[in-house]
C-alpha cells in the first residue's frame, strides 16, 4: 500500500509551494549617510570655539590623551563604549548592579523565555504526531433473525498523523513565532538601554545636586563672613542698620538652596534605588561633574547607520516580519490541507494472542480537505492579517522616522549644551573677579553695599546656572547614546 501511495506523495511534494507575500523591510538609514549638526553662522561658531579653546588650554583629557586627538579617535560613536565618556568606575558598578537586579529587566528576560517556548510549539506541527493507543472492549450484535453474537477485542496500535505543509502554513507560523522572539529580544535590549541611561542620568543628577550643595555652602560661608564685617562696620557707625539687614537677607538665600538640595538629593537617591533593585541605601559617588564634562567629547556627525542598532527600530521591524508571516498563514489556510494518517498494531479476541502474526492490523491514508463554503471566514481572516501587515509597516516607518529625529535632536542638544556651558563658565570667572573687586572696594569704603550685594547675587546665580548647564551637557550626551542604540563595556548591545 505504501508503494502504491508513493507516487501520489511525490507528485504532491513537487506541486507544493509556500503561499504568501515575500518580506522586505527597507533600512531606516541609507548606506553612507550621516547625522550632522545644522549649519551655524561663522561669527557665532568662532565665538563659541574661542570660549571652548580658552577653557581647555590647560586641560588634558582624563585618559591622558589630548582633546584634539580624542576627537579623531572618537569620530565614530559605534566604537565608543557606553560609559567610557564619563570615566567613572562607580557609575559602572551601579549600572552592573541594575542590570542584575532591576525588576523590569528581569521581567523582560522572562518574557523572552515565554516567546521562545511558544516558538518551540510552532515548530512541532512540522513533524509527525505519534501516539500509542490501547483498548479492551466487548460488543453484542443482534440481527433479529439469529441469536445475538458477542465480540471481544483487545487492540494495541501506534498511530501517526502528519499534516504535509505543502502551502507553507506551518512554516509561516514558525517564521512568525521566531520573529516574535526576535522582537522580544529587541524589547529586552530596549529595556537595558533605557535602564542604563536612566541610571546614568540619575547618577549625574546626584553629582549635580552635590555640586549645588557645595556651591551653596561656600556661598553661605562667604556671606556670613561679609555679614560679620558689615556688623563691625555698623558698630563703628560706618553703615546703617538697613545695610546690615540687607546682608542678613542675603545669607538666607544659599540656606534655602541647601534645604532644597538636601530634599532633592534624597528623592534622587530613592529613585536610583528603585532602578538598582535595592532598598533604601546610600548611593556612592565617584568622580565629579566637572571631571565628567572635561572628559566628554562628541563628534559633530555620526553615521546614520547606527540607527539600525536601536532596539525600538529592530522591534518594529521584527513585528512587521511577524505580521507578514501571519498573512502567509492566512493565505495558506485557504488552500486544501493534506493529511497523512496511519496506524500499525495488533488486535485479538484474547490478550494472550496479541502480537501474533495473524492479529496484525495497519492502515495508511492520504486525505485532502477542500474548503467549499465557510461564510467568508477564511477570506475575512486573510483581510484582517493584510490590514495588520499594513499597520506594522507604517509603525516600522514611524519608528525609523522617530529614531532619526531623536538622534538629530540629541546631537544638537549635546553641542548646544557644550556651547552654553562654555559661556556660563566664562561668565562665572568674570563674576568671581568682579566680586573680589567689589569686596575690596567695599572694605576700602569705595563702593556701596548695593554693589557688593549685586556682585554676590550675580555670582551665586551664575554658579548654579553653570552647574545645571554641565548636567544638561552630560545628560544630552546620554540621550545621544540612547538615540543611537547605545553601547557599553563589553561591546555594546
Show the residue positions of the predicted features.
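Terminal intrinsically disordered/low-complexity segments used for targeting and assembly
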Residues: 1-97, 154, 178, 262-308, ...
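Transmembrane beta-strands of outer-membrane beta-barrel proteins
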Residues: 131-135, 161, 339-343
Amino acid at each position: 500500500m505504501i508503494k502504491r501511495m508513493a507516487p501520489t506523495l511525490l507528485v504532491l511534494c513537487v506541486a507544493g509551494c509556500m503561499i504568501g507575500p515575500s518580506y522586505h523591510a527597507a533600512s531606516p538609514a541609507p548606506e553612507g549617510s550621516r547625522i550632522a549638526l545644522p549649519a551655524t553662522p561663522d561669527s557665532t561658531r568662532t565665538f563659541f570655539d574661542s570660549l571652548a579653546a580658552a577653557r581647555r588650554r590647560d586641560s588634558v583629557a582624563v585618559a591622558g590623551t589630548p582633546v584634539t586627538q580624542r576627537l579623531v579617535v572618537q569620530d565614530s560613536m559605534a566604537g565608543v563604549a557606553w560609559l567610557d565618556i564619563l570615566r567613572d568606575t562607580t557609575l559602572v558598578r551601579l549600572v552592573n548592579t541594575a542590570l542584575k537586579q532591576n525588576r523590569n529587566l528581569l521581567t523582560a528576560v522572562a518574557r523572552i523565555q515565554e516567546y521562545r517556548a511558544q516558538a518551540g510549539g510552532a515548530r512541532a506541527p512540522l513533524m509527525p504526531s505519534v501516539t500509542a493507543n490501547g483498548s479492551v472492549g466487548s460488543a453484542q450484535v443482534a440481527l433479529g433473525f439469529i441469536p445475538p453474537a458477542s465480540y471481544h477485542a483487545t487492540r494495541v496500535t501506534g498511530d501517526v498523523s502528519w499534516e504535509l505543509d505543502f502551502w507553507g502554513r506551518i512554516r509561516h507560523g514558525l517564521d512568525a513565532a521566531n520573529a516574535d522572539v526576535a522582537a522580544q529580544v529587541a524589547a529586552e535590549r530596549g529595556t537595558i538601554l533605557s535602564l542604563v541611561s536612566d541610571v546614568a542620568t540619575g547618577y549625574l543628577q546626584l553629582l549635580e545636586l552635590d555640586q549645588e550643595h557645595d556651591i551653596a555652602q561656600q556661598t553661605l560661608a562667604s556671606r556670613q563672613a561679609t555679614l560679620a564685617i558689615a556688623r563691625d562696620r555698623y558698630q563703628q557707625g560706618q553703615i546703617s542698620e538697613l545695610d546690615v539687614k540687607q546682608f542678613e537677607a542675603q545669607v538666607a538665600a544659599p540656606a534655602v538652596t541647601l534645604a532644597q538640595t538636601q530634599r532633592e538629593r534624597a528623592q534622587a537617591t530613592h529613585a536610583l534605588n528603585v532602578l538598582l533593585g535595592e532598598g533604601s541605601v546610600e548611593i556612592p559617588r565617584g568622580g565629579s561633574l566637572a571631571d565628567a564634562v572635561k572628559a566628554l567629547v562628541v563628534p559633530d556627525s555620526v553615521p546614520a547607520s547606527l540607527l539600525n542598532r536601536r532596539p525600538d527600530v529592530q522591534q518594529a521591524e521584527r513585528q512587521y516580519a511577524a505580521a507578514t508571516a501571519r498573512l502567509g498563514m492566512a493565505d495558506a489556510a485557504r488552500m486544501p490541507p493534506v493529511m497523512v494518517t496511519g496506524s500499525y498494531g495488533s488486535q485479538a479476541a484474547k490478550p494472550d494472542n496479541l502480537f501474533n502474526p495473524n492479529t496484525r492490523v495497519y492502515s495508511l491514508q492520504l486525505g485532502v480537505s477542500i474548503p467549499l463554503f465557510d461564510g467568508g471566514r477564511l477570506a475575512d481572516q486573510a483581510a484582517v492579517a493584510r490590514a495588520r501587515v499594513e499597520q506594522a509597516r507604517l509603525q516600522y516607518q514611524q519608528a525609523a522616522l522617530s529614531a532619526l529625529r531623536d538622534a538629530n535632536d540629541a546631537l544638537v542638544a549635546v553641542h548646544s549644551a557644550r556651547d552654553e556651558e562654555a559661556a556660563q563658565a566664562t561668565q562665572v570667572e568674570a563674576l568671581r573677579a568682579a566680586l573680589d573687586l567689589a569686596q575690596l572696594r567695599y572694605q576700602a569704603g569705595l563702593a556701596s553695599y548695593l554693589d557688593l550685594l549685586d556682585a554676590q547675587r550675580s555670582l551665586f546665580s551664575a554658579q548654579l546656572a553653570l552647574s545645571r548647564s554641565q548636567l544638561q551637557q552630560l545628560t544630552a550626551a546620554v540621550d545621544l547614546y540612547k538615540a543611537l542604540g547605545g553601547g557599553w563595556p563589553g561591546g555594546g548591545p
